[in-house]
A protein has these predicted regions:
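Binding-site signature for planar aromatic cofactors or substrates
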Residues: 1-217
Length: 217
């Protein structure tokens, strides 16, 4: 993919809400990164303030934030219960772009989580989610995981292939207070812009609820 499809210097870019910019970049990634475009790195901290990162899949995004789901029994869920601050990093190498989001997480209403689970088309992923009630717990062998998956498949045969959303699946919405867009350039003069919510009058005025700053690459 050519990276000459627009510059962060464009005034049209700077006048947009950052979520609109993200939508534009995300749609481009869908075309050029068809298998990995929804993936991001979620970073949280534990009770000892030690960082932890893992790859997640974005479920949805809108003007209110970035949505993703997790096992409520997992370490990351425990991290977010104790510390609601988190960051997301999207990296699309074919597009030569990266987006880093920082903000506060909140749990999504139960009916929204169930709707997301019901509308998901990855049946094998659903089966695995149900089988792995206690995520990240030590196990003696993966044989037990496969046995549990087969038990669920047999259950589906007698229940119209339906899969209810497990109670331990939790949905999160990350409300951004800072979004950074990075466009890699061949001459290493990368373009990097940060949009954030605050009252710093020294920064440039962007969208009505955001201000922007250029950052060195």
């Amino acid at each position: 993919m050519s990276n000459n499809d627009g510059s962060l210097l464009d005034s049209d870019f700077l006048n947009k809400n950052p979520m609109e910019i993200f939508q534009q970049w995300y749609n481009t990634a869908k075309v050029h990164e068809p298998k990995s475009f929804p993936l991001f790195t979620l970073s949280t901290v534990d009770e000892m303030n030690k960082p932890h990162s893992r790859t997640m899949a974005l479920v949805k995004y809108d003007l209110n934030g970035f949505k993703f789901c997790s096992n409520g029994n997992s370490p990351k869920a425990n991290h977010l219960r104790n510390n609601q601050f988190a960051s997301l990093c999207f990296y699309w190498p074919n597009c030569q772009r990266q987006v880093v989001v920082e903000g506060t997480t909140e749990e999504m209403p139960r009916h929204q989580v169930e709707a997301i689970f019901a509308n998901g088309t990855n049946i094998e992923g659903k089966i695995t989610n149900i089988a792995l009630e206690f995520q990240s717990e030590p196990i003696a062998s993966y044989d037990r995981v496969n046995e549990k998956r087969e038990e669920i498949r047999r259950w589906m045969l007698f229940n119209a292939n339906s899969l209810p959303c497990p109670g331990y699946i939790v949905g999160y919405n990350l409300i951004p207070d800072k979004i950074e867009f990075l466009k890699f350039n061949e001459n290493y003069a990368h373009e990097r812009i940060q949009l954030r919510r605050n009252d710093d009058k020294t920064a440039n005025s962007g969208n009505e609820s955001w201000i922007f700053q250029w950052l060195t690459p």
